[in-house]
Design a protein with these regions (language model features):
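Conserved redox-active cysteine motifs that mediate thiol-disulfide chemistry
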Residues: 7-21
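Structural motif
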Residues: 7, 37-38, 70
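Short pre-active-site segment immediately N-terminal to redox-active cysteine/selenocysteine motifs
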Residues: 1, 8-11, 54
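Non-catalytic, surface beta->alpha helical segment in thiol-disulfide oxidoreductase systems
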Residues: 54, 59-89
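Active-site loop/turn elements of alpha/beta-hydrolase fold enzymes
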Residues: 9, 40, 63
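Structural micro-motif
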Residues: 3, 44, 50-59
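Conserved helix-turn-beta segment immediately C-terminal to the redox Cys motif
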Residues: 1-2, 17-38
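Acidic phosphotransfer microenvironment of two-component signaling modules
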Residues: 44-45, 77
């Protein structure tokens, strides 16, 4: 299954604002992908490895490879569009 990752931090107000939309997408797409979160402050090696410099950043992975990313998606619809467009490539 593809994996959708939300790189976020507790001190980031926008991260907290999109969290409910991310969680809903994770539930809605549970049959087709795995959704998870990586805390910016707790995983500096992963942040550096994937070149995350702005949060929230969502990344979509498949078979261990990053397929794409989006910074600060504005809504549940934007997250869904990112998933559809990225998986269609």
């Amino acid at each position: 299954k593809p994996v959708l990752v939300d790189f976020w931090a507790q001190w980031c107000p926008y991260c907290r604002r999109i969290a409910p939309a991310f969680d809903k997408v994770g539930e809605q797409y549970a049959d087709t992908l795995i959704a998870g979160k990586i805390n910016y402050d707790e995983e500096p090696q992963l942040i550096q490895r994937f070149g995350i410099d702005t949060i929230p950043t969502l990344m979509l992975f498949k078979d261990g490879k990053a397929l794409g990313s989006v910074v600060a998606p504005g809504s549940k619809a934007a997250i869904e569009a990112f998933i559809r467009e990225t998986l269609a490539q």
